[in-house]
């Protein structure tokens, strides 16, 4: 696998969110059978192992989250950063890099966006705490700036059941 990634100059898009519920949730919540939970854990551990091997072999890694899968929300991408930190063991800075500059590079738009610097385009979130210290700070967005317009305290429709279940896995 590593050889093929290097030959093709490919990126690995690590996506832990879809497998986490099937691997780690109580089956009474997911309604998964014992076999489905076993298989979910095989997939989850495989994703973690693949990400670790890619990083150890200098394969570029980015993050995805497969919005549309059960237990995945459009407002929770920050969890994917937390999961790669917690389960793969990367630093908070590396997690942020995979979701910003590295993702822009993979998309072929790294010269235009992905980092905050003169001449580049950027949509920004403003948060009260430093995600380099704790990635969970990303969940409390104070402001969004997009295309030059700011949105103070954006309101997001949150599913409390999904949030409560997923929050159980935010402990380091």
Where are these regions (language model features)?
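Structured helix-beta-strand junction loops
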Residues: 4-8, 57-58, 138-141
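Short, acidic/turn-prone active-site loops that include or flank metal/cofactor-
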Residues: 16-20, 89, 149-150
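Active-site core of metal-dependent hydrolases
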Residues: 1-45, 68, 104-107, 128
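His/Asp/Glu-enriched, well-ordered alpha-helical/loop segment
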Residues: 32-36, 44-130
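Generic beta-sheet signal
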Residues: 13-15, 64, 147
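Extracytoplasmic/secreted cell-surface and envelope-processing proteins
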Residues: 1, 71-74, 136
């Amino acid at each position: 696998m590593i050889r093929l990634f290097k030959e093709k100059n490919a990126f690995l898009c690590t996506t832990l969110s879809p497998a986490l519920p099937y691997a780690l949730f109580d089956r009474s919540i997911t309604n998964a059978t014992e076999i489905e939970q076993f298989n979910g854990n095989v997939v989850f551990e495989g994703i973690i192992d693949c990400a670790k091997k890619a990083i150890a072999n200098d394969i570029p890694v980015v993050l995805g989250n497969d919005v549309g899968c059960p237990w995945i929300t459009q407002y929770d991408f920050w969890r994917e950063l937390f999961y790669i930190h917690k389960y793969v063991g990367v630093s908070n800075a590396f997690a942020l890099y995979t979701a910003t500059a590295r993702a822009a590079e993979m998309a072929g738009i790294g010269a235009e966006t992905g980092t905050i610097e003169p001449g580049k385009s950027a949509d920004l979130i403003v948060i009260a705490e430093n995600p380099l210290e704790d990635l969970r700070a990303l969940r409390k967005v104070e402001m969004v700036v997009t295309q030059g317009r700011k949105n103070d305290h954006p309101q997001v429709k949150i599913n409390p059941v999904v949030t409560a279940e997923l929050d159980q896995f935010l402990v380091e």
